Amino acid sequence: MTNEFHHVTVLLHETVDMLDIKPDGIYVDATLGGAGHSSYLLSQLSEKGHLYCFDQDQKAIDNAQVRLKDYIDKGMVTFIKDNFRNLKSNLEALGVSEIDGILYDLGVSSPQLDERERGFSYKQDAKLDMRMNEEASLTAYDVVNTYPYNDLVRIFFKYGEDKFSKQIARKIEQARQVKPIETTTELAEIIKSAKPAKELKKKGHPAKQIFQAIRIEVNDELGAADESIQEALDLLAVDGRISVITFHSLEDRLTKQLFKEASTVDVPKGLPFIPEDLQPKVALVNRKPILPSQEELEANNRSHSAKLRVAKKIRK
């Protein structure tokens, strides 16, 4: 692994093992990141199996080309540099119309958080950026400096669930009238100034939820996850499985809802029989999310909010 892209994989064995890997199957890692899940999944495949890896961050792909070299040399890996919302079109272009399993590790990866110049973290001073795809046009700077007050309030409430969204948006509006807000530290200080003193004494950084909200907006994370998971459920072969790791309530709620819609039937109660074409195509593998073990929680602080949900295809 390259030094620049160190990433501790969360729920490594649980996520892959729950896919019930077939050695000669076709699998997708929709969020390559540090390639931890990919490496473990590939170790379960024979040379007839294949893994398609998506990431929009070229640095993640460069790292994986080193880490997964032995499997690449055997022709077992294909990298796709694109947003996973384009899952189906990319796979179809490669002649893949059905898959045996897919995994998602949603949210920002550790290397992106740790790389100061990417501008994701309130803990390190950097230019406001937060793009997972460095070729994308919209940045955190654009959101903070150009979004109208009402739009800032909307995304802070919707994606950050911060009860001081209005006060924070007003402080941002006032500050940018004097000069543009350019760095993560500047923004974090403005957020802190908008919150009452008793809030600042609470556990956790006062800027965490707002930084999350801006990051989700910049990368359209929830929109992309919604589209991609729906495409994944469609692509799965019968008995194929999908594993999704989430790190905050918005992602988990979305995943839970998508799985629920696919695994339940929307018909009037009391019908003596449900027609074949109305039967659900998906079944939940775990009704309650799988959480990290105590051992993992102690070893990796970033695993604390992780939840794993798994579903399987039961008919086409």
Swiss-Prot record:
| Keywords assigned | Cytoplasm, Methyltransferase, rRNA processing, S-adenosyl-L-methionine, Transferase
Q: What GO terms are given for molecular function? A: rRNA (cytosine-N4-)-methyltransferase activity
Biological process (GO) annotations held by this record are: rRNA base methylation
Main location (coarse class): cytoplasm
Q: Which residues does the annotation say bind S-adenosyl-L-methionine?
A: 35-37, 55, 84, 105, 112
KW Transferase (keyword) present: yes
Q: Name one Pfam family in it.
A: Methyltransf_5
Catalytic reaction list? cytidine(1402) in 16S rRNA + S-adenosyl-L-methionine = N(4)-methylcytidine(1402) in 16S rRNA + S-adenosyl-L-homocysteine + H(+)
Name one cellular component (GO) term.
cytoplasm
The enzyme's first-digit EC class, named in words, is transferase
Q: Which SUPFAM superfamilies match?
A: Putative methyltransferase TM0872, insert domain, S-adenosyl-L-methionine-dependent methyltransferases
Q: What is its EC number?
A: 2.1.1.199
Q: Where in the cell is it found?
A: Cytoplasm
Q: Does the keyword Thylakoid apply?
A: no
What job does the chain carry out? Specifically methylates the N4 position of cytidine in position 1402 (C1402) of 16S rRNA.
Q: Could you say which protein family the record assigns here? A: Belongs to the methyltransferase superfamily. RsmH family.
Name of the protein in its database record: Ribosomal RNA small subunit methyltransferase H
Query: What is the originating organism of this protein?
Result: Streptococcus thermophilus (strain ATCC BAA-491 / LMD-9)
